[in-house]
A protein has these predicted regions:
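Short, aromatic-enriched amphipathic alpha-helices that serve as compact interaction elements
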Residues: 2-18, 32
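Proline-rich intrinsically disordered, low-complexity coils
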Residues: 3, 20, 35, 118-120
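Context-gated lysine
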Residues: 4, 16, 22, 48, ...
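Residue-level signal for functionally critical sites in structured catalytic/ligand-binding pockets
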Residues: 10, 15, 25, 79-81
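Detector for Asparagine
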Residues: 12, 17, 36-37, 65, ...
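Short solvent-exposed beta->alpha transition segments
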Residues: 20-74
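Exposed beta-sheet edge and beta->alpha loop/turn motif
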Residues: 69-125
Length: 125
């Protein structure tokens, strides 16, 4: 999977967080988190609380998103992500993905290593 597609998959999952069941979007986002990121933000229950907390709750059930490439190499990519949340407020994030170089079934997969704190960008109206 292309690195941008990893970001898009995660955002689309969060956009429909409770489909097909409660918190499936967060779980799918977790599955694409780099092992180093999982160590910092996990286990999964803690990750769920983090995403539902004040810093990242605007990602849950957001209305739309755009993903713009900032930097890409053969092992790392950074994207600017803008989301319109369910309250019609825009937020910007820096989303970093890296190619996993650890042995195992995720070897050579692009996985999220970091997501910045959101930057409020104002209302859509």
């Amino acid at each position: 999977i292309d690195p941008k597609q990893v970001v898009v998959i995660q955002l689309n999952a969060l956009m429909k967080n409770d489909s097909p069941y409660k918190d499936r979007g967060i779980e799918q986002t977790w599955e694409f988190a780099h092992p180093n990121n999982q160590r910092m933000t996990g286990p999964l229950d803690r990750f769920k609380r983090m995403l539902k907390g004040a810093s990242y709750s605007m990602l849950i059930d957001h209305k739309e998103n755009t993903v713009t490439e900032i930097y890409k190499s053969s092992t790392m990519a950074t994207y600017e992500v803008v989301v319109l949340d369910k309250d019609k407020q825009y937020f910007k994030f820096k989303w970093k993905v890296e190619k996993n170089n650890k042995e195992g079934n995720l070897l050579d997969c692009w996985l999220t290593t970091a997501v910045s704190q959101p930057i409020p960008m104002g209302s859509s109206i």
